[in-house]
Amino acid sequence: MSTELLTTAVDCFWLFFGGVLVFFMQTGFTMVEAGFTRSKNTGNIIMKNIVDFMFGSIIYWFIGYGLMYGEGNGFIGIPFGDMFMNGMAGAENMDYTALFFQTVFCATSATIVSGAMAERTNFKAYCIYSAAISLFIYPIAGHWVWGGGWLSELGFHDFAGSAIVHMLGGTLSFVGAAILGPRIGKYTKDGKVNVIPGHNILIGALGVLILWVGWFGFNPASTGGLSDGGVQVAAKVFITTNLAACAAAITTMFFTWIRYGKPDVSMTLNGVLGGLVAITAPCDLVTPFASIIIGVVGAILMCLAIPFIDTKLKVDDPVGAISVHGICGLWGTIAVGLFASDTSAGAELLGLFYGGGLKALGVQALGAVSLIAWAAIVGSILFVVLKKAGLLGVKPQEEIEGLDSTEHGLASAYPDFVVSYNEKRSM
């Protein structure tokens, strides 16, 4: 085997390995959403997360990849030359690998929205907007940054998706949850906010730990390979990713301890995710120390955003997806313009704190505003149309009964528990 073939094989394996870890994150998202919500909707949550990957894989292969990476203009790729990955028989191994790796990223962006709109969304509507995210919302945004589009030309940097995946998903989560409305009983007429606890914190914690593992594919494998200096960048990204997550978790634990008198379990778990989201854009360009600062700030922003969105804006987000992915994704995007200090990865930019002036910060801010506007405008149109058509939310009685039963004909995700409970009641 020649050196060139061996290098290609190693790079392909690296991307496939990372892609499998990112695919496994679907399990983590499913468990976080299920654990943080009520048991009567568990089966529905499982179906939604499976739908994201099923639809996402077919749709992204069909047209999404072409929209994202096809030759076109600064706004959109022209998909027809790349539809079905046209000419697959002559495609290089790395083309197939890149398709798989980007497919799992696309599915992740769609999955984020599921948590914020949990427990009251019509399954038909979910299938429609999940497909729309994979069809054009994510690919067009991705083209702007990763497909050679206009933000890429300006020097916008998002190494692994703080903006393209997480901020995009968080923005869609916000407009979707706001338009859909809250769960029954979440807010009273006199303005009181009721806590609706999840049914299994253990499942939620296991989901977070699985996501943490998956992030070691999400970020390091975004080098695109291990050759041409990729291994050095990947090694650094492992460290910055992990440090940011740990710093964010510690910060969240002490923040809630001081503010509420006890360290909050679910908030600390979300703190891990907030740190991971925040470091995803700058992880290749920042020092380990800077990654800790990014994690700390991300955690504080998340801790402030969750109660603000819940109690002030009255937007019901059962899992905190808007804050974790939207707010922390925005912070991570801006953090590039502040803390970027390593140009060895190929990005010709330095952050404000490292002598780069305001240029990089301005580009990152422009990119963030543009991507938020894209997701908010398109998402609002999509969700309003679904609501006007009577498809977006389920009927009140269906929500009360639980979506497992009304949407899927599943008596319970925990039938043994239901049988035991009913037996005790009949005694």
Language model region names:
Residues 1-427:
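Glycine- and aromatic-enriched membrane alpha-helices
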